[in-house]
Amino acid sequence: YRRQRQMCIRDSNFPKKINLNFVDYMLLEQEFKRAEDGTRLLDHESITVEFKLTEGQDGIFARRVADYTNYTFTPTAEADKAFAKPERIIEETEALSRPATFWAENRPQAAISEQENSVDKLMTQLRGYPVYYWTEKILSILFTGYIPTSKEAPLFYIGPMNATISGNTLEGPRLRAGGMTTAWLNPHLFGKGYIAYGFKDERVKGLAELEYSFKKKKEYANEFPIHSLKLRYESDVNQYGQNYLYTSKDNVFLALKREKDDRIGYFRQAELTYTNEFYSGFSFQLTARRRTDESSYLIPFLQKEGDVLTPVKEYSTSAAELKLRYAPNEKFFQTQWNRFPVSLDAPVFTLSHTIAGKGVLGSDYTYNHTEAGVQKRFWFSAFGYTDVILKAGKVWDKVPFPLLIMPNANLSYTIQPESYSLMNAMEFMNDEYFSWDVTYFLNGWLFNRIPLLKKLKWREIVSCRGLYGHLSDKNNPELSDGLFAFPIADTRAMGKTPYVEVGVGIENIFKVLRLDYVWRLTYRDSPGIDKSGLRISLHMTF
């Protein structure tokens, strides 16, 4: 509803038949008052929402009421001090721990009833129902992976639970246990780690991490903004050509593979990392790293000199790395261990460079590796939106194959961001590349014209991922001596044709599932490859 004379919106509601998950009804009401100069100031705001998990069931009615008072346009020392801070939202330390008496005395609208201020009571009542209680627990473990050691202010989280049981060709069955501390134990000092054991190779692996935060944290170490110094040591297996960006390699949902997972060696790595994030969206990381890669019977290191192959058990690099990132107005969903982007409306720029010198701190090779990337979401009004990710990189020196650029292959049947669903691990070797990942979400633009599909609220997806790469002669063991021979017979350098795969999919199946069917368009004559396949993932959206 809009006042004609004042030309301002007073209230707004969503149609009941809108293609929106979980929300059956929504009403927004706002009241304004005029300042002395005629400016309209928001005085009162009320948002009413009725949530429903499924049709035909009772929903949850929620109402949020906010009142705004004490506007002032007179400059004050307190205001100058507040606006000088870089934070967009300033939250006092004690804001979340005020007693009930404080709010009773200071809440500006006495008309707010007890029912409108009883979220805690509502949640307690809901958790009294076994279905809701166990659904909340299961979803929490699925999406965060961690179990708190207590209901209130847990000192320690156990997990990730979805990485407890896994396996691969080198290790056989693998068990893993770990956890991390929280700010309730110490708001500045955080610990994290795990221990794992493979029953086939009978080797113990693990990670130990200690991080000092210069900023006081509320719950977790990775809360924005991060300003920390982290010491980390890890000894584990290296799954060549596989790098899962938003989940652990031990995730049980990745256990079922479309091909044998046998491109695996070992590594030991010590890192010291300084991280600083700014409210402007700019951040940087400085890392000093000592890494040793060890061969295995699956991935032998055989140094080639003419026709002679000499076994090498391991090699080491001592490197420094600088990462720059600029993501203005970025929004993300934060879990205990990771961040998942929820808004890519503003572009995200990344730039990194890694450098190592032969003989410096025991490094066996000179190594320079540069990476750059940009990602952006483009909206097309009622026609949906497109997420675009572009990346490029180059290795500048002559190095063995583990230090080359291996495209990120996804061997599981799940949908994984920035990976190739039909490429085999170590299928291609490059020392320079350019890649793209384009996904078009139509938001029901086509399906909404079909009555049954509109009722199901299914939504269409079209995707295209590709990579153009090149391997120079100096890094090709077939053309240059002193390198490790490629351990996999099917490994090749890319030709002039880029690798391309496309997919069509449906999301919002049962409101939580996404299904894609993917086709491989190029290099279809390669032995042992999948030319097409069905992929699935959990994808909850409104």
Q: Where do the language-model regions lie?
A:
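Single conserved hydrophobic/aromatic residue that forms the stacking wall/gate
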Residues: 1-9
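Compositionally biased, intrinsically disordered low-complexity regions enriched in proline and serine
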Residues: 2, 69, 130-134
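Exposed, low-structure sequence patches enriched in small/polar residues
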Residues: 9, 85-542
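Acidic, serine/threonine-rich low-complexity disordered tracts
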Residues: 11-75
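Cleavable N-terminal export/targeting peptides
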Residues: 67-91
